[in-house]
A protein has these predicted regions:
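Active-site helix/loop module of the DD-peptidase/beta-lactamase fold
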Residues: 29-56, 61, 70, 314-353, ...
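Active-site-adjacent helix/loop patches that line small-molecule binding or acyl-intermediate pockets
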Residues: 240-265, 333-448, 474-480, 484-488
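Bacterial N-terminal signal peptides
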Residues: 9-18
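Active-site Gly/Thr loop motif
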Residues: 450-457, 508-577
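Active-site-proximal binding-pocket segments
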Residues: 436-513
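Active-site-proximal alpha-helical segments within enzyme catalytic domains
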Residues: 305, 412-422, 469-492, 555-572
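N-terminal leader/targeting segments and the immediately adjacent pre-domain N-terminus
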Residues: 21-287, 585-594
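Active-site SXXK
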Residues: 294-319, 345, 416-420, 479-482, ...
Length: 594
């Protein structure tokens, strides 16, 4: 969780006006007027206007694809044509921000879908380019005026190679067995960045090539993708929920927030996702299962806490009491790390940091980032695990020691990540790692088939260490599945994936409570425990309960409500409000545990 990201709202208002002016309708039986065959084949380099996202989808007179897609799109590096014209800063850590990277993206088509073979952040060979890209499944189809060619579109994200944000985009092209048209893309939304200071959109044509080839293990990939479709949590529009409970109960769901900063929000009720629109500068995003979010510090909970709970289930709850110094080479010039445990690091209570000694009241963000920003940025940009550890161990310690007071520090969570990596390698061998454990033993059993993250960069081709402080890229479906696991005591389909006792502690279902944050809402003071932000809430009966949640930079919020619902709001700036909790309570009253 980083401090509030202040967006340049006026730019987005301009974009929205431009889009509304350019939207065109395609009545049934009429040919499309936007992104036509001629547009895609001629690829006018001056055509860089954002257009409505719906034009990247099948028209009303579309039919099935006329060709099977099997091969690689070869995309060259090209300047991004952005609004505003220049991205600031122009380079970050020596890497250019204005250029799309050169990539080869392999796809296959099946059942009307265009499916990437590699469903992860793609690496490129240019050390001077800032961006990584990840593609998600799209669609293939045909339209009458495309001269016998087929059409395809797909969603993707861009993210900085050291960042935790996601810039949401969509692309389309024509293809047949001989070749492809130009690729038309546009970048239309984003989560809050850290280094990038320009909220931008981008659009343009790219001349691409189609390298046709058989898809290796196509049978297995098709089987896996069809299972992925079967495992999707149903997504329903907000209007469906309104028709069930009445719009008056939902009216202030996003109250207290800046509407222009909300990308989407919603409720997960009885394994159905009821979502508000996926807002962008070009209208609603047309791929709800393919809109991937960089959720920043929500990763501490959805990845970090869940990984610790999985280790506790495998090795015992005592892993929370393991000392960091027994698993890492600590180079600090003080003894502050001597008694710091894995649990202390997850609780943000290491007693390490450059903040003040002011404790009455304590402020959880005292000393966070801006207290020593130059030092923070050096640590942030350090590529390898050893360099990151050496930087973080230079931080001073407080007099009070571990376990006493909470101070929010990404660096402590990274120390935990490195220690967890050391632990699993000692137990399971040098090839074991936390990310593989999470994918194989938690995410895949939940039906999360594709999820991505970032690692440190090590020399000699060695695998990197997982970031836990930020780096997870998820969809609302992923959020619903992880939340359901936590709401279900860590059990899924009769299999206990997470340690039930420690999970109950994290959710305040035992007598153990976390440390005060110095923050409060209208119901009382908040606290922090095991990466969860706990917000007090007064029930209709007058009892006070605690609502645990994940939070991320820019206002990313997920609340695990004790009535079994999950509320989420994904944003890129602005203030928080209590509306989600109030609405959930109206639909299904929250009750205090007896």
């Amino acid at each position: 969780m980083k401090t509030k990201y202040i967006r340049i709202i006026c730019l987005w208002l301009v974009f929205a006006v431009c889009v509304s002016c350019q939207q065109e309708t395609n009545p049934p039986g009429l040919s499309r007027q936007v992104l036509t065959y001629q547009d895609l084949m001629s690829a006018d380099p001056g055509d860089t206007a954002i257009i409505a996202n719906r034009h990247f989808m099948p028209s009303e007179d579309a039919g099935g694809a006329l060709h099977t897609f099997s091969g690689k799109l070869v995309i060259p590096a090209v300047p991004m044509m952005t609004t505003p014209a220049k991205i600031a800063p122009a380079n970050i850590n020596g890497k250019a921000t204005q250029t799309l990277p050169a990539l080869g993206i392999e796809f296959f088509s099946v059942d009307g879908y265009l499916v990437p073979v590699v469903r992860d952040l793609l690496n490129h060979s240019d050390p001077d380019n800032f961006w990584q890209l990840q593609a998600d499944p799209g669609r293939v189809w045909s339209e009458p005026d495309d001269n016998g060619m087929s059409r395809a579109s797909f969603p993707f994200i861009l993210t900085g190679d050291v960042e935790g944000d996601a810039w949401n985009a969509i692309a389309t092209f024509l293809y047949d067995d001989q070749g492809v048209s130009a690729l038309r893309y546009q970048v239309v939304q984003h989560s809050a960045p850290y280094f990038i200071t320009t909220p931008f959109t981008a659009a343009g044509f790219v001349d691409i090539a189609y390298d046709t080839m058989p898809t290796a293990d196509r049978t297995g990939l098709v089987r896996a993708f069809r299972q992925e479709l079967a495992d999707r949590t149903p997504i329903r529009p907000w209007s469906d929920l309104a028709s069930q409970v009445g719009m008056e109960k939902l009216s202030d769901f996003d109250a207290g927030t800046k509407p222009e900063a909300v990308i989407t929000s919603g409720l997960v009720i009885d394994d159905v996702i009821y979502t508000r629109p996926f807002a962008t500068a070009a209208g609603d995003f047309p791929y709800p299962y393919g809109m991937r979010f960089g959720v920043w510090s929500m990763s501490k909970s959805m990845l970090g806490m869940v990984a610790m709970l999985r280790l506790a289930q495998k090795y015992g709850a005592e892993v929370f009491a393991y000392r960091i110094g027994d698993y890492l080479e600590v180079t600090a010039p003080h003894d502050g790390w001597n008694e710091v445990t894995f649990g202390d690091a997850l609780n943000m209570a290491t007693g390490i940091g450059s903040g003040s000694d002011q404790l009455s009241p304590n402020n959880i963000t005292d000393g966070y980032i801006y207290g020593d920003q130059q030092e923070y940025d050096r640590w942030y940009l350090a590529p390898s695990v050893r360099e990151k550890l050496d930087y973080l161990f230079q931080n001073p310690n407080h007099d009070w020691g571990p376990g006493e007071h909470v101070r929010y520090r990404d660096r402590d969570i990274f120390a935990l990540s490195a220690a967890m990596d050391s632990l699993i390698k000692r137990r399971e061998g040098p090839d074991a790692d936390i990310w593989r454990m999470m994918v194989e033993e938690v995410y895949t059993p939940l039906g999360i088939h594709r999820i991505s993250t970032k690692f440190t960069t090590e020399g000699n081709g060695q695998p990197g260490v997982l970031f836990l402080g930020w780096s997870l890229y998820v969809t609302v479906d992923d959020i619903s599945k992880i939340s359901r696991l936590l709401q279900s005591g860590g059990s899924y389909k009769g299999r206990q994936l997470l340690h039930a006792g420690k999970l109950a502690e994290a959710l305040y279902q035992t007598g153990i409570r976390g440390l005060p944050t110095g923050r409060s809402n209208t119901h009382g003071p908040g606290s922090y425990h095991m990466s969860l932000w706990h917000s007090p809430f007064t029930t209709d009966e007058g009892s006070q309960v605690s609502i645990p949640g994940f939070q991320g930079w820019g206002g990313m919020t997920v609340n695990l409500i004790p009535n079994g619902m999950t509320a989420y709001r994904l944003k890129n700036g602005g203030d928080e409000g209590p509306g989600m909790l109030e609405v959930a309570n109206r639909i299904r009253p929250v009750e205090a545990k007896k």
